[in-house]
Design a protein with these regions (language model features):
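C-terminal outer-membrane beta-barrel translocator/porin domains of Gram-negative envelope proteins
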Residues: 215-220, 224-322
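Membrane-embedded beta-strand positions of outer-membrane beta-barrel proteins
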Residues: 68-70, 86, 105-107, 132-136, ...
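Transmembrane beta-strand segments that form the barrel wall of outer-membrane beta-barrel proteins
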Residues: 65-74, 98-111, 117, 234-244, ...
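Short loop/turn motifs that connect adjacent beta-strands in outer-membrane beta-barrel proteins
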Residues: 53-64, 92-100, 126-131, 179-180, ...
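Extracellular loop and loop/strand-boundary signature of outer-membrane beta-barrel proteins
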Residues: 105-106, 154-159, 200-206, 242-248, ...
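Gram-negative/organellar outer-membrane beta-barrel architecture
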Residues: 58-68, 72-211, 367, 375-389
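Outer-membrane beta-barrel "beta-signal"
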Residues: 216-219, 355-363, 378-389
Length: 389
């Protein structure tokens, strides 16, 4: 079963690539009779092939460019799932200085009972003076839980099932300052409910129905040419959020997240990407709001949410190489850790990651990614949109 999504992904990619080569490479010249013949009606399969064959053409001259993609995908936490994505990119035709804004509406469901839908995007105001970053989603998620702390996560005997019902909304309004600096307020809401707990003792007596209301600020320096698929530039960001009692929080705490990323084209068809990331929760955070090893993005190779504690650190380097036409591949390596106190970090608590991935350019500079990662006594396979970081 775990190989099925890989085979489907490769089969679809091969069909699209072959169709494109047929269209471009072996079309015979028309005879006089052909030139006056009525156009043949295309069936649904031909229309789909034509759509994907031209989906990566540069359409920046269009005021609004919308695309649709769907199909099977896989991750260790959700198993085999069917996903659909409607993606739009838009900008003012009269403002060449402003990057293209983007919006995505997505939905997915799996054979395990997982379903998720939401909307996310980045809206750039004229002349890039302000940016609105938004994300809202709802999910029903059969998951596994190991407990809190590295020792609990590393204990295979703690692996247990539960179901997570979650709603999240986050907003950031960023104002541009000189030298590519952005600063602005941020708001966050989340609802988390754990049900059908196989091992309630692993929650250490914490509540299983949680509302979290947060306010804070974001400060960043961003010179990337394209946030979702950068080839040059760097990003340094600080996200500080407070969850005080007066806002209705049962668990009062604050959370700090810091990220630094750098991208450089070392050769014509190859890019190296570097990321260092850290998150810390102070006070009395609940199990749902603790930092977790970033297994869904940079530190691939682990079950997402397995390792969680008050602090998380990770560092990853990735090489991205164009391969042929719309195809490319990546290789990466890195390390991460979760801990309550810095004194707990040692070679036994480090969590390495390494892996390889396939890339296919769905739209101009928007990639579909398929990654296979290996971690410490763990491995994972996932399919997604855009680069991991």
């Amino acid at each position: 079963m775990k190989r099925l999504p890989i085979l489907l992904f490769c089969l679809i990619s091969a069909i699209i690539c072959s169709a494109q080569e047929i269209r471009e490479g072996i079309s015979a010249p028309e005879s006089p009779a052909d030139s006056v013949a009525a156009p043949r009606k295309r069936n649904i399969i031909q229309k789909v092939i034509d759509y994907f064959a031209h989906s990566n053409e540069d359409k920046s001259d269009k005021k609004f460019d919308i695309s649709v993609i769907g199909g099977p995908s896989y991750s260790e936490s959700t198993s085999l799932k069917i996903a659909a994505l409607i993606s739009g990119m838009y900008k003012s035709r009269h403002d060449s200085l402003t990057p293209r804004s983007d919006v995505s509406i997505y939905g997915q469901g799996s054979i395990t009972g997982f379903y998720n839908f939401g909307i996310r995007g980045n809206h750039f105001f004229p002349q890039d003076k302000m940016r609105l970053v938004y994300d809202a989603n709802f999910c029903h998620f059969p998951l596994k839980f190991w407990g809190i702390g590295y020792a609990q996560g590393a204990n295979k005997a703690n692996e247990s099932d539960y179901t997570l019902l979650q709603s999240e909304v986050s907003l950031q309004l960023l104002f541009r300052l000189p030298h590519h600096i952005f600063i602005g307020p941020a708001a966050q809401f989340s609802y988390n409910r754990a049900t059908k707990q196989e091992r309630p003792d692993l929650w250490d007596g914490q509540g299983t129905r949680l509302f979290n209301y947060g306010m804070g600020f974001v400060l960043s320096v961003d010179t990337r040419d394209l946030p979702g698929n950068a080839s040059t530039g760097y990003y340094i960001g600080l996200n500080q959020t407070f969850f005080p009692r007066f806002m209705g929080n049962d668990y009062t705490f604050s959370r700090t997240e810091v990220s630094a990323m750098y991208y450089h084209r070392f050769w014509a068809s190859g890019i190296m990407a570097f990321r260092v990331h850290g998150a810390a929760a102070y006070g009395n955070p609940s199990w749902a709001m603790l930092p977790t090893l970033d297994a869904g993005n940079a530190v691939r190779g682990y079950y997402e949410g397995r390792y969680r504690d008050k602090n998380e650190l990770d560092a990853v380097v990735e090489v991205r190489q164009h391969l042929y036409r719309r195809f490319g591949f990546v290789v990466w390596g890195g390390i991460g850790s979760v801990f309550e106190h810095f004194s707990q970090i040692n070679r036994h608590t480090l969590l390495p990651t390494a892996g390889i991935g396939l890339r296919w350019e769905f739209k101009n500079r928007v990639n579909v990614r398929a990654d296979f990662g290996v971690g410490k006594h763990s491995k994972s396979f996932s399919v997604g949109i855009n680069e991991a970081f």
